[in-house]
UniProtKB/Swiss-Prot annotation:
Naturally occurring in which organism (per UniProt): Anaeromyxobacter sp. (strain Fw109-5)
Official protein name in the record: Dual-specificity RNA methyltransferase RlmN
Family under the similarity heading: Belongs to the radical SAM superfamily. RlmN family.
Catalyzed reaction equations: adenosine(2503) in 23S rRNA + 2 reduced [2Fe-2S]-[ferredoxin] + 2 S-adenosyl-L-methionine = 2-methyladenosine(2503) in 23S rRNA + 5'-deoxyadenosine + L-methionine + 2 oxidized [2Fe-2S]-[ferredoxin] + S-adenosyl-L-homocysteine; adenosine(37) in tRNA + 2 reduced [2Fe-2S]-[ferredoxin] + 2 S-adenosyl-L-methionine = 2-methyladenosine(37) in tRNA + 5'-deoxyadenosine + L-methionine + 2 oxidized [2Fe-2S]-[ferredoxin] + S-adenosyl-L-homocysteine
Binding locations of [4Fe-4S] cluster: C122, C126, C129
Biological process annotations from GO: rRNA base methylation; tRNA methylation
Length: 377
């Protein structure tokens, strides 16, 4: 007698906010509607950031009812909002399945930037990053990525800090997660965010940061026009192996070769992010090696003094060492900028995002003891 079979699971309903225009066109055709309805939906969802189907006031009620049956619509619930003394705002968003992710808004006189998350947690495991202590819960969908932008835009207007449907000017994919490890969702989200019928961000104002997934760096360069940032943080393989386990798979030589072949458009440069860890990677010898490593690559270096995280065994560099490091790079004709510490008082600075598994979360394991890094070669 054969064992009973479980009934087949129904296909999950597509998420409207994750659908590019061509998918919307196929959807409305399947529902018996004319093609112009797809562009109408696209504008509501991606340009105006509609939070519910009820907001689609010029879409027939019958079509809205059919969409409600055939699809879902990604929404993020704002779980917390924290404002720093410097004006930075950190939002924690709750997803439909109860996961928590964070976005950080950084206003400046000439721009309004949102730091966007791409995953719930992160599997890369950089030893100086609090997000890395969480592990990876799951990837975010394209809709969950772009919804961070829509929700931020709406909230900025509510707070009186911007006007129009899109007060944000810049996006940086430097939040929770490794964006290139969720490339499929990232690519769809980028297409939606750059769309003329959507938020219409300029590719010059969108930056994707990676810890060094070499094959996906090449893919990003081939398939999108956005800017690239590399989280480098070390000048030898021995150093980087200890700080960033991904280096054991894609060592510095491979990473830098991918950077050299990355298409540079309109005189733009690759940004190399370098977190300065006191007594670990902040020697002047490191600065000299860094200049040598990036030689021949159109480069901007962002120096990031380490932001202290309780439970992680690192310390910030001495202020005078930061200046000396920067001057050593400048003497070798490198543009090096010391990034301002934004939102440190609300744990919104670089390496501090951990909506789940943070220092106060009893589920978070104790960090391993720090061992001395191998001597730089």
């Amino acid at each position: 007698m054969s064992a009973p079979h479980d009934p087949p699971r129904p296909e999950p309903r597509p998420d409207l906010r994750s659908l590019p225009l061509d998918r919307l066109e196929r959807l409305v055709a399947a529902l018996g509607e004319r093609p112009f309805r797809a562009r109408q939906l696209h504008r509501w969802l991606q340009q105006k950031g509609a939070a519910s189907l009820d907001e689609l006031t010029d879409v027939p009620r019958a079509l809205r009812a059919a969409l409600a049956e055939a699809t879902t619509l990604t929404t993020l619930e704002r779980a917390t909002e924290q404002r720093s003394v410097d004006g930075t705002i950190k939002w924690t968003w709750r997803t439909h399945d109860g996961k928590l992710v964070e976005s950080v808004y950084m206003p400046e006189p000439d721009r309004r930037t949102l730091c966007v998350s791409s995953q719930v947690g992160c599997a890369v495991g950089c030893t100086f990053c609090l997000t890395g202590t969480m592990g990876l819960a799951r990837n975010l969908t394209p809709g969950e990525i772009v919804e961070q932008v829509h929700r931020a835009n709406r909230r900025i207007v509510e707070l009186g800090e911007g006007q129009g449907p899109r007060p944000l000017t810049n996006l940086v994919f430097m939040g929770m997660g490794e964006p290139l490890a969720n490339y499929r969702s990232l690519k769809v989200a980028l297409d939606l965010l750059l769309s003329e019928d959507g938020p219409n961000f300029s590719h010059r104002h969108v930056t994707v940061s990676t810890s060094g997934l070499v094959p996906m760096i090449r893919k990003l360069g081939e398939e999108t026009p956005v800017k690239l940032a590399i989280s480098l943080n070390a000048t030898t393989d021995a150093q980087r192996d200890a700080l960033m386990p991904i280096n054991r798979r894609y060592p510095l030589a491979q990473l830098l070769e991918a950077c050299r072949s990355f298409p540079i458009r309109n005189g733009r440069r690759i940004t190399f992010e370098y977190v300065l860890l006191g007594g670990v990677n902040d020697s002047l010898e490191d600065a000299v090696r860094l200049a040598r490593l990036v030689r021949g690559i159109p480069t901007k270096v962002n120096l990031i003094p380490y932001n202290a995280n309780p439970g992680l065994p690192y310390r910030a560099p001495a202020p005078e060492r930061v200046v000396e490091f920067q001057e050593t790079l400048a003497a070798r004709n490198l543009t090096a900028v010391v990034r301002k510490n934004r939102g440190g008082d609300i744990s919104a600075a670089c390496g501090q995002l951990a909506a789940e598994g943070g220092p106060g979360d009893p589920r978070r394991p104790a960090p391993p003891p720090l061992t001395r890094l191998p001597a730089a070669g």
